[in-house]
Amino acid sequence: MFSWLKKGGARGQRPEAIRTVTSSLKELYRTKLLPLEEHYRFGSFHSPALEDADFDGKPMVLVAGQYSTGKTSFIQYLLEQEVPGSRVGPEPTTDCFVAVMHGETEGTVPGNALVVDPEKPFRKLNPFGNTFLNRFMCAQLPNQVLESISIIDTPGILSGAKQRVSRGYDFPAVLRWFAERVDLIILLFDAHKLEISDEFSEAIGALRGHEDKIRVVLNKADMVETQQLMRVYGALMWALGKVVGTPEVLRVYIGSFWSQPLLVPDNRRLFELEEQDLFRDIQGLPRHAALRKLNDLVKRARLVRVHAYIISYLKKEMPTVFGKENKKKQLILKLPVIFAKIQLEHHISPGDFPDCQKMQELLMAHDFTKFHSLKPKLLEALDDMLAQDIAKLMPLLRQEELESVEAGVQGGAFEGTRMGPFVERGPDEAIEDGEEGSEDDAEWVVTKDKSKYDEIFYNLAPADGKLSGSKAKTWMVGTKLPNSVLGRIWKLSDVDRDGMLDDEEFALASHLIEAKLEGHGLPTNLPRRLVPPSKRRQKGSAE
């Protein structure tokens, strides 16, 4: 599984292909698209102008869902680490937008400080006001997963009577702003209490136009039995069909994305396969980052072109002296007809036009006399960018990506899916080498319980004093812990990396499993006090 992932020097580095294409996109935007946006006030009607940080930033994943669907737990499951300032509980615990990003030390940065940082891609969030900025923060922590991607945690979307309480800022508009800039949108649903509230429907509507980025996760699926899960899945697909409004079916992943034992383990194999598919999607984000930016720039350019035609048409229809206000009202009322006329005259696809009702509302606040007439040179530059410059970048992107070292998201839960017998591999594939454990003469903390673990070990019928990976897996799966967690335990326990466990390694694995079941975390590397005594001696003599 994930055979294309390499553990070499690519970690933390972006391929040269992405840097080259990204710099070209920045130059094209500044020289050919931005002048048109400024001339026709595109930022006042749609999204504000892009900055260098929008092009240079890491891929971002937006996690959204109703309260208590497991959004924060999902993020902590991916990172295998708690997020600073986060809380987990059945009530709406996340009341703000949290940008989870890499940092050398753990800490949080408040929203007002975040939007003035030129290195972060959040400067254009300033117009949403102080109420929103007080509900926005960045959580920084040293984590290998965050070296490749950033994750946006969102407030729990309210349901029932709670959704009538105002947030004090335009929540759907903020979601739309993030949706335009992220690489992947994950919508979480709770299999145990499936519902789509009015606010959630409005939030999903704000994501319209970005359906290609959306992935749906049916979380907490271990709380229901197989027959109930089938009914819940069918109900979810029916509800999504009503809300999303596209004929295409969204990809739905089913699982239980936290590091606790499965409550109903009947569908364990299904959850494993679904988790692997979702992880592949996330791990591929760094490789496809430049392509996504190119795609989003083309989408933006097409909208800017249509916007220029609309604004210039309204300017042309305005009288020079009298009756300006009445004419403005007439033009806004006739906007659907104007859209159809522009579409036929300039041979533009209906999908390139903005939402007519929203455009009518925005136009009410603008002075049409300050609009500009059509500037053919600006439009020619835009058409040249779409027809010539972007087309030249496509083969360059493909060629340079082939020549570059492919790097994916590593660390956290992604590491556990590739460890020992818990990795999906072909029959001839060998277990990958891992990092060696530490050595020390300190007392082994597992000794006091080793007799208990030895009884289990010998009942599993080891061959030549060692337990094979398949036998160990059968026993470990019985603990109902997720495969990604068991994979990390295997990596820590198989100290000599021979793909089998001797009595000491098995005792170590049992100790780590018990610690995890009691709610403790797993170490990133094996601490010196946990390294089996015989392995310390072997390593010492080898040196």
Curated annotation (Swiss-Prot):
UniProt: ATP binding residues: G65, Q66, Y67, S68, T69, G70, K71, T72, K220, W258
GO MF annotation, one: GTP binding
Keyword set, alphabetical order: ATP-binding, Calcium, Cell membrane, Cytoplasm, Endosome, Hydrolase, Membrane, Metal-binding, Nucleotide-binding, Phosphoprotein
Localization per Swiss-Prot or TrEMBL: Cell membrane; Membrane, Caveola; Endosome membrane; Cytoplasm, Cytosol
Protein activity control: The very low intrinsic ATPase activity is increased upon interaction with liposomes.
Main location, first listed in the record: membrane
Region called G1 motif, residue ranges: 65-72
Residue ranges constituting the Dynamin-type G domain according to the UniProt record: 55-286
Region: G3 motif, residue numbers: 153-156
Region G4 motif, residue ranges: 219-222
EH domain sequence ranges: 449-537
GO BP, one annotated term: cortical actin cytoskeleton organization
Modified residues annotated as Phosphoserine in this record: S3, S44, S438, S468, S470, S484, S493
Tissue distribution of the protein: Detected in lung and adipocytes. Detected at lower levels in heart and skeletal muscle.
Region (G5 motif): 243
Repeat keyword on record: no
CDD domains xref list: EH, EHD
Domain notes: The EH domain interacts with Asn-Pro-Phe (NPF) motifs of target proteins.
Assembly mode: Homodimer and homooligomer. Interacts with EHD1. May also interact with EHD3 and EHD4. Interacts with MYOF. Interacts with EHBP1. Interacts with FER1L5 (via second C2 domain). Interacts with CAV1 in a cholesterol-dependent manner. Interacts (via EH domain) with PACSIN2 (via NPF motifs); this interaction probably stabilizes the caveolae.
Name assigned to this protein: EH domain-containing protein 2
Organism: Mus musculus
